[in-house]
Amino acid sequence: MKKLSALIPALLFMTVFTVNAAWEQPTLGYTLSPLSKPVEAPNFKLEDMDENEYDFSEYRGKVVLLNFWATWCPPCKREMPSMERVYQKYQGDNFTVIGVNQMEDGDRIFSFTGSLDTRPTFDILLDSESKVSQAYEVRGLPTTYLIDKQGKIRYRAIGGREFDHQEVEKIIQSLMNE
């Protein structure tokens, strides 16, 4: 009985912590803010975790969901699965997703993506000096831009989103049909 009474506070703490941890998860929205006037997306060259270089200009002709994120960012982690789902759904239709990680190394990103239920298959690029995020005027993470086939930024979202929500998918389909 003495062992059980000593165990009860620990079990109570673990239960309360688990419930509160789930309760405190950031909610994800689904709205994207249209830019009043589309602007040219800044071009950049970045490497992925395997040191392969990507030139953003090579994505011209595709609708691009460009997401700035970091492993320490809870809403970034929460929105990753929805980015993968929308990528899988539309990738063959002139659409792609690019994740631009902020100031973290490839080993940390590899470990993080490996811990997710579904490992992302879209391109993840490293902005180790945060120069690309500065060019895109990123002020908080996650920040996402939806770029049309002509390379113009058309929509922006600051904070976590469910990118496979039907409202977001309508926007993506609309841009793909232009």
What is the meaning of each model-derived region?
Residues 8-16:
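Bacterial N-terminal signal peptides
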Residues 38, 43-64:
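A short beta-strand-turn-helix
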Residues 60, 68-85:
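Conserved redox-active cysteine motifs that mediate thiol-disulfide chemistry
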Residues 1-8:
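Bacterial N-terminal signal peptides that target proteins for export
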Residues 19-43:
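N-proximal helix/coil linker or "cap" segments that precede and/or mark the start of modular domains
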Residues 98, 110-150:
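Short, internal strand/loop/helix patches
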Residues 146-178:
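Thiol-/selenol-based redox modules, centered on thioredoxin-like
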